[in-house]
């Protein structure tokens, strides 16, 4: 199978700023258009074009150190909550609370607006996770970034029981070389989670081709189901190299699931 992809991104913003500079408000929005053509393909997947993601949101900065953001998204024929959080920043230190991605995985940390590759990697899609409600501490300087957070493992629509489980995630990023023309970025991360009753009974990892053209149901080429889970660890490492317009990105993620009455599961992905 060979897949030819293209991506068109449309971004719009509107700003309002106070004369004293202590208040700033902006509306944000974007739409991602994806197209794909499959050839030399034995699976007979269809060609097509889709609007893969639409976002509409607003963000505000106030009282010098406070920022807030609310964003909704439309994808797969439904509206969903995206980033909804408040941050307090003082110098290199920041506290963050709300609904957002935990500190895990390179593409999830960047978000679709800042993807350097055309789509999210298969590794991130399989071993990453969705946004969760939680809080975190972040230290960010020119040379290093460290972060740690505690998150609920439940869904924001609260359709499941209240025994949701939890996630603890931490990450360290070092930039030994960083200027306008050169960057060396080295990151490591760890994540521990305990889950609700339904996920303890069965959890799955699945992935497909790196494209938004196919529906989620048909774009599954690898699937692993694990039963009788006790808890789960995930580990990650990533590297970014940049030199005068040349960009290289690589990442390795691994998941280890401890099971009751069965062999533990370990899965890995790299690109």
Q: Which residues make up each language-model segment?
A:
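Cleavable N-terminal export/targeting peptides
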Residues: 1-16
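Short intrinsically disordered, low-complexity coil segments enriched in acidic
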Residues: 2-3, 269-271
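Outer membrane beta-barrel
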Residues: 16-156, 160-196, 269
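Surface-exposed beta-loop-beta
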Residues: 166-266
